[in-house]
């Protein structure tokens, strides 16, 4: 397998989709009963084992989540599905196989004979390039052309509860013998358009201004993120980012630098030193929730975007990954919740039929209001010091320029904190960045670990320069994943119906309705199997039961 293939299989797109329904119920302050007892995760009993599937030689059972862990109780991390081997009592009706007059690859894929010996990996395993006695006939001949990172990420899916899909259904390194070149005026390069991508357009632009918002409460930022990233699904404030079903053969290389190993519990986060570095969704949302218990804080929310290009996927005759087709074939024809949930967690609940690629740059500064008052610093001063009130200019090669006012920073006592540990204006900075290379992420991580709290517009410029090498989806039109099931596949109609049902059950299984309400106007959020209360600024505690 080539490095490009490994990249296509491993790429993960960090698309957080937080979904909000109606208002969260809460206790009246007069009904406050004190700190509630911990609630442990409670699951139903296992169902009976299913009949032995004659083709899969497996049988299945499932269970449901009745109550999620809350108030420091045990969270729900166990699978809802189970399987075991069995000896079938019925014969398996194998579908007719074969490619007729076409060439059958080692992967089982059928391709036209004209695609043999052309130096392209049309089979996915290079078996079409074996036994070539004549000179190869490359489609692009002597024309200079590069593989497009934008095209290779096109079509990648999302999970409506926010988890990153572990694989893509599309084989975007299949070209069907064509050499369709697309010119990128920014990198001055011709890129080859894959067969699955009907349209690929390079059009680089950046937001002229940063968007900045300030909030008095952390829940306001959480709601802002939800409103901007939610989809029109009735899923409530529920987020799930850890797969727990049977997907043992899939592994993910996270191109957006999500450090899964750094996930921490709320108690551990509270005990850690300031200025932590994280791209982990777990840490981001738990950190925002933890600040609801602290007084005299203000939150500056900074957002910037760079758009590199657009794509539209082909609507018919797409070339799907062999692993995706194998996964569909191994789905049982009877509805087994655990198996279908596992499929959704592997490939996503939806895929992108069209969209934009680039990067999103988002920072949340936690400011100390008392320190600002003592130094006579206003929010506008902070924005000017960091450079986030300036217009940006974009040049060829995705070069973004901008400057920050270092003289103003020094005058106001907001000097660079790597050399000025007394500058306690910035309590923390929480990064929420999508796109860009690992090299940039490492540099930013090292800067934050040295104690630098003033991540400024220069850091944005450095990040933007790396986007050509690692773009991500920044907007997309979504289509249910079951629409990709080939109509000629055995039991296609049954499995499509089962997947449609599974998406609805998936939302209901991981629903915030299985949480207990918070007290005193607190908002309950379901974070990866645990219900967490985000409190108004006047209250704190696991249930917002304590008045500050």
From Swiss-Prot:
Residues 97-134 form the LDL-receptor class A domain. Residues 515-545 form the EGF-like domain. SMART domains: LDLa, MACPF, TSP1. Glycans are attached at residue 456. One of its GO terms (cellular component) is other organism cell membrane. Phosphorylation sites are present in the extracellular medium. Residues 40-93 form the TSP type-1 domain. Keywords: Complement alternate pathway, Complement pathway, Cytolysis, Disulfide bond, EGF-like domain, Glycoprotein, Immunity, Innate immunity, Membrane, Membrane attack complex, Secreted, Signal, Target cell membrane, Target membrane, Transmembrane, Transmembrane beta strand. It comes from the Eukaryota. Homooligomer; about 20 C9 chains oligomerize to give rise to a huge beta-barrel that forms a 100 Angstrom diameter pore in target membranes. Component of the membrane attack complex (MAC), composed of complement C5b, C6, C7, C8A, C8B, C8G and multiple copies of the pore-forming subunit C9. Belongs to the complement C6/C7/C8/C9 family. This is Complement component C9. It comes from Bos taurus (Bovine).
